[in-house]
Regions:
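Short Gly/Ser/Thr- and charged-rich N-terminal loops/segments
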Residues: 4, 19-21
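Accessible peptide chain termini
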Residues: 1-2, 34
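Serine residues within intrinsically disordered or low-complexity segments
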Residues: 2-4, 11
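Conserved active-site and SAM-binding loop architecture
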Residues: 7, 14-17, 27-268
Length: 268
C-alpha cells in the first residue's frame, strides 16, 4: 500500500511515515483553502484561552487524524458524542476524507473539544532532511502537510467563533512542528509517554488553549529510574519497534483519560 504525492510514492510501512496513518488516497499539493461558511477572516488572529464548559456533562468531541481512535474511545467511555475523521476508513471512523477538504458542515455538531494528531512524517527529525530546509518544505508531501495543517487550524478558528469555550489539543511527536510559523500562536506542553504508563519514552508536543489541563512532569533520556525502553535511533525498541504506523500512532490511555477529564472538569 502506498501514497502518491506528485511524483513520489511513500510505502504504508515506510519508517519515514512516523505516526502517519499510511494514506491510501491520491493526494496532491494544493493551496491553503480559506475558511468557508463565514465572512470573517480569523487566520492570523490569536486564539482565546478558554476554560472548558460542557453544558450537559458530556459534550461533543471531534477527533481529527483519528487512526486507532485512542482519544475518541476514551471520550465515548466518558459519555461524550464523538465524530472521528481520518484519511482512511479504519474501524469506527465516521468520515474518511482528505482533511484538507474537510469543512465544518461535514461535522454533525459544534464541538466542545477538538483533538488533532496530524501526520508527523515531514516534521520528524529522522526525515527532516528529506522533506524540509528548516521549516520550508522541499518535498511535495511536506507542502501538502503544511496545507492540511493550516486548513484544520482554520476549522478550529471557525468553531471557536461559534463556541468560544471550546478547547482544542494538537499532538505531534517532538520535532520540527514546534518550529513551524503556523504553530507559534499556541501554548505548547511536552509530555513523555512513559509517564503515562507506556513502555516508550516518546517525547510529544501538545498545543492547547486549555487552562485546566496540566501534564505530568517530563522524563529524560537515560533515566534509570524510569521503566521506558532505551531506543537509540535505528533500534527496534520504543516507537521504532512498533509494527506499522497504525500501532506507532496509538496514544497512552492514561494520557487520553487525563485530556478528557480535564476537558469536562469545569462542567456547570
Amino acid at each position: 500500500m502506498s501514497l502518491s504525492v506528485g511524483k513520489n510514492k511513500i510505502s504504508y510501512n515506510d519508517p519515514r511515515l512516523c505516526e502517519g496513518q499510511g494514506l491510501e488516497l491520491q493526494i496532491f499539493n494544493k493551496p491553503q483553502k480559506m475558511i468557508r461558511n463565514t465572512n470573517v477572516d480569523v487566520t492570523n488572529k490569536a486564539l482565546p484561552f478558554a476554560k472548558p464548559m460542557l453544558a450537559d456533562g458530556t459534550g461533543n468531541l471531534v477527533e481529527l487524524f483519528a487512526g486507532s481512535r485512542s482519544v475518541g474511545s476514551v471520550a465515548e467511555a466518558k459519555g461524550m458524542n464523538v465524530f472521528s475523521v481520518d484519511w482512511q476508513k479504519f474501524d469506527k471512523i465516521d468520515l474518511a476524507i482528505d482533511i484538507e477538504e474537510l469543512q465544518t458542515k461535514d461535522v454533525p455538531f459544534i464541538p466542545d473539544v477538538v483533538w488533532a494528531s496530524p501526520d508527523c512524517t515531514t516534521y520528524t527529525i529522522a526525515a527532516i532532511s528529506t522533506h524540509r530546509n528548516g521549516t520550508e518544505p522541499k518535498s511535495d508531501y511536506a507542502k501538502k502537510c503544511d496545507a492540511v495543517n493550516k486548513h484544520f487550524i482554520s476549522l478550529i478558528d471557525e468553531w471557536l467563533l461559534i463556541n468560544p469555550k471550546m478547547v482544542f489539543f494538537i499532538e505531534n511527536p517532538r520535532g520540527m512542528m514546534r518550529k513551524m510559523p503556523f504553530m507559534q500562536r499556541f501554548k505548547r506542553h511536552t509530555v513523555w509517554y512513559c509517564t503515562y504508563g507506556d513502555d516508550r519514552a516518546k517525547p510529544t508536543d501538545i498545543w492547547t488553549n486549555s487552562e485546566v489541563w496540566q501534564p505530568r512532569p517530563m522524563c529524560h533520556n537515560g533515566n534509570k529510574n524510569c521503566h521506558h525502553q532505551p531506543a537509540p535511533r535505528g533500534s527496534k525498541t520504543g516507537t521504532q519497534g512498533k509494527k506499522g504506523s497504525y500501532n506507532r500512532s496509538k496514544i497512552p490511555t492514561e494520557l487520553c483519560q487525563e485530556i478528557i477529564e480535564s476537558s469536562i472538569l469545569a462542567v456547570v
